[in-house]
A protein has these predicted regions:
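Bacterial N-terminal signal peptides that target proteins for export
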Residues: 1-16
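Sec/Tat signal peptide C-region and signal peptidase I cleavage site
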Residues: 23-32
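N-terminal segment of the mature folded domain
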Residues: 86-125
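Pocket-lining segment of extracytoplasmic ligand-binding domains
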Residues: 97-99, 106-115, 135-139, 177-277
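Ligand-binding clefts/hinges and TM-proximal coupling segments of bilobed small-molecule sensing domains
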Residues: 144, 150-169, 240-310
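An extracytoplasmic/periplasmic, membrane-proximal ligand-sensing/linker region
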Residues: 204-227, 235-238, 279-349
Length: 349
């Protein structure tokens, strides 16, 4: 690990540098020197955000005509990745509606945070994730509702992850005691089997894709998903939460205790600093729009985006309308007759 300014910790730095050098070595000397850099910060290796970023980086490099080298940089969590971009360590940040909301309000991990570069603005929203909790099958009879996890040791995903933040706010809304135990993702199955944690947050993308560490856990461990109870769902809806239905057959390869589960969704995206050029960001968004069906074939998590690309951008902006929209996205939405004059356009580019 390499310590970074502002407390950020960059994982796999040597791998990232090696990847850049390898790409540069394939280019003619003049071209390698002329290519500009776009640093794409994500969550740590093994997370869904990191895994799919590599595929999107290839699409983006092609769309930009070889003018840029896109480097995927893994960080401890999306929160750290966001801060890294706003302290000059990247241009594109992996984030979600909940993280953008906390940043806008300067709450949670963003309390007292002071960016040293122009701030993140709405740019591109890519897929929803659905937060649930799973337990080892041998312990399933002990847990019927989420209230049964109150005050119990649970791995709520990596601290600072958007699903971790989502679980934290859910517990707060329901009045439950949030007792997080931090473990390595690779230890997820063992921790559940041994009882180090009694539950672990499990999440799907678009009700389909599991993160890499949960795919591994699915092979190694028999587990059950603990559904929200009706009174919990009612309380969350009354507080303004959306509830998504996840069909087990679309997300899991084995019996996990039911055919459908109710989950609390969050919307993930890749937002950039306000000072990135309008033309660059417009080309980026248009490339993902044009390649949306191709992205869906690469990973089913992109299915909702492919079906309603424009609507997903509108949803992302409306989640935190106090945050400005990048001029590149504003141009794209105006072309598609989807711009809302109540939104504000960032003036930093």
């Amino acid at each position: 690990m390499t310590a970074r300014k502002g407390g950020a910790i960059l994982l796999g730095a040597a791998t990232t540098v090696a990847a850049v050098l390898a790409v540069s070595a394939l280019l003619p000397p003049a071209e390698a020197q002329q290519r500009k850099s776009l640093r794409w910060t994500t969550a740590q290796v093994g997370s869904y955000g990191y895994t799919v970023a590599a595929s999107m980086a290839k699409v983006l490099e092609q769309a930009l005509g070889g003018e840029y080298t896109v480097t995927v940089q893994p960080y401890q969590s999306p929160t750290v990745a966001m801060k890294a971009v706003m302290t000059g360590e990247g241009e594109i940040a992996y984030t979600a509606d909940i993280g953008m909301g906390e940043f806008a309000e300067r709450t949670g991990p963003f309390k007292d945070f002071k960016p040293t570069t122009p701030e993140l603005v709405h740019t591109w929203y890519a897929y929803p994730m659905e937060t649930m909790i799973a337990v080892a099958a041998k312990d399933a009879d002990k847990y019927k509702c989420w209230k049964d996890f109150s005050g119990k040791p649970v791995y709520f995903s990596q601290a600072g992850f958007q699903n971790w933040l989502n679980a934290q706010r859910i517990f707060k809304t329901l009045g439950y005691d949030f007792k997080h135990v931090q473990i390595d993702n690779k230890a997820n199955a063992d921790a559940l089997e041994r009882g180090t944690v009694v539950g672990s947050v499990i999440y799907t993308t678009a009700g389909r894709s599991l993160p890499a560490y949960w795919k591994e856990s699915e092979v190694r461990l028999d587990f059950k998903v603990v559904d929200l109870c009706p009174d919990e769902v009612a309380k969350l809806k009354a507080a303004g939460y959306g509830i998504a239905e996840v069909e087990a057959k679309n997300a899991f390869t084995k019996d996990v205790g039911g055919t459908k589960f109710e989950a609390v969704p969050i919307l993930f995206g890749y937002n950039v600093r306000a000072d990135l050029p309008e033309d660059l960001v417009y080309k980026m968004i248009k490339a993902f729009y044009d390649k949306r069906d191709e992205l869906m074939k690469i990973d089913p998590g992109f299915t909702p985006m492919a079906k309603d690309f424009i609507g997903m951008q509108v949803q992302g902006i409306n989640s935190t309308p106090q945050i400005a929209v990048h001029p590149g996205l504003a141009k794209f939405l105006k072309e598609h007759k989807a711009w809302n004059d109540k939104w504000k356009i960032a003036g930093g580019s």
